[in-house]
């Protein structure tokens, strides 16, 4: 295939008022078999390797841990932390930044209530955080960092901040990627492929920027491989036999299941933070959790089966 004949164009672009963006792209003139190869590679890179920004910790005046209650605030700490995960941020710097909030009730707190440095922009300022139902004052300090994929709150880091409650952070700016491959005939009646890619982002990056950045990451990856000398020593080949398979669900946060508040809080209080943690529980063991009833269990079972094809045994 002559790469100079490849054609890529954006054939659809949409932006939702609350922030998310959607784009559809067409890559034409591909040889047979190349559509699915490029589609799979782009999808993995777009979902796993692009950099994003998220709140990674909070310090709340008068609060010691995530199981505390804040006087005069409708939500508990776990609900507030869950709401904070929905705030979409865009940063002009990779450095750690801090934001602050100080508000006296009664008041409804949204993302726009947070005071941020000029390098940080809130994409969805109307996103709900909490409600102060009395005249109490709520003070929160936010730790904001950049990264890729997601990071669990219970992962240990040497630079943890004292008095901060660490939060699960989703850095991924691309929320969803779909693609399909179609066969077409060129002018010489030869079968060619065209690749249609659909990209949804959280609004901190456009689909056009996402596919451009993802393509460059792939190019640089293969460029670095091509510049290295291949080591054919037998020791290196033997080492590959000792690589242990990784459970694909081990590090997926339970927030990805998008459970309702009650079962989510029960799981978090039981220190069930990932799908891997959840898979350690049988249905009977789950029902033994405090305040975890049959309705919550049925929701968890159904969500695991419908989203991941997993059935607890």
Curated annotation (Swiss-Prot):
Keywords in alphabetical order: Chloroplast, DNA-directed RNA polymerase, Nucleotidyltransferase, Plastid, Transcription, Transferase
Q: What does this protein do?
A: DNA-dependent RNA polymerase catalyzes the transcription of DNA into RNA using the four ribonucleoside triphosphates as substrates.
One cellular component term (GO) for this entry is: chloroplast
Region described as Alpha C-terminal domain (alpha-CTD) = 243-313
UniProt GO molecular function: DNA binding; DNA-directed RNA polymerase activity; protein dimerization activity
Q: Name one Pfam family in it.
A: RNA_pol_L
Check the UniProt entry and state the signal peptide residues, or none.
none
Q: What is known of its domains?
A: The N-terminal domain is essential for RNAP assembly and basal transcription, whereas the C-terminal domain is involved in interaction with transcriptional regulators and with upstream promoter elements.
A single GO BP: DNA-templated transcription
Give, as one word, the top-level EC class.
transferase
Q: What name is this protein filed under? A: DNA-directed RNA polymerase subunit alpha
> What's the chief localization of this chain?
plastid
The gene for this chain is rpoA
